[in-house]
Amino acid sequence: MSMRIGQGYDVHAFGEGEKIVIGGVVIPHHHGLVAHSDGDVLLHALCDALLGAVALGDIGKHFPDTDMQYRNADSRSLLRMVYAKVSQHGWKLANADMTIVAQAPRMASYIPHMVEVIASDLQSSASQINVKATTSERLGFTGREEGIACYAVVLLESR
C-alpha cells in the first residue's frame, strides 16, 4: 500500500463581523475574519494539506481569490471538491491532524462538532480526524488577537 503525507497552513486577520467559521462551525466572536471566502482557516489548511499530498498545488491554484465565483464561498464546499480531486487520483484519507492557533475565542467546546463536520465532508470516521487548539501565549499576531492561524497534516493511502 502506498502512502502520502501533506502539510497545510493558513492564516486570516480579524476584521469586522460578529462571528467566525472554523472547521465548518459558526463561532460567535466580537470580530469576523478578513477573507475572500468564509475565512475558515482550518478547512483552508486542510485543503492545502490534501492537495499537497497528491502534488496538486494549493487552494489558491484551484480557487483563486481573483475569481468572483469563490467570493464568500462555503469552505466546506471547497473541501468536498478538493477531496473529490484527491479521490479521483486514487487516494483516500488515513488520518488528518489539525492545530488551531488563537488567543481567542476559546475553541474547546466547538471541537467535537468540527470533527463531525470534517469527518462527514471527507467521508471518513471521526476516529480519523483530530482537531486541537492552542494559544501562542500572547506572542505574535495570534497572541495580540490580530488573527487566527491553523496547521494541518494529512496521511493518505492508496485506494
UniProtKB/Swiss-Prot annotation:
GO terms for molecular function: 2-C-methyl-D-erythritol 2,4-cyclodiphosphate synthase activity; metal ion binding. Its EC number is 4.6.1.12. Pathway: Isoprenoid biosynthesis; isopentenyl diphosphate biosynthesis via DXP pathway; isopentenyl diphosphate from 1-deoxy-D-xylulose 5-phosphate: step 4/6. Homotrimer. This is 2-C-methyl-D-erythritol 2,4-cyclodiphosphate synthase. A divalent metal cation binds at residues 10, 12, 44. It comes from Cellvibrio japonicus (strain Ueda107). Involved in the biosynthesis of isopentenyl diphosphate (IPP) and dimethylallyl diphosphate (DMAPP), two major building blocks of isoprenoid compounds. Catalyzes the conversion of 4-diphosphocytidyl-2-C-methyl-D-erythritol 2-phosphate (CDP-ME2P) to 2-C-methyl-D-erythritol 2,4-cyclodiphosphate (ME-CPP) with a corresponding release of cytidine 5-monophosphate (CMP). PANTHER family: 2-C-METHYL-D-ERYTHRITOL 2,4-CYCLODIPHOSPHATE SYNTHASE, CHLOROPLASTIC.
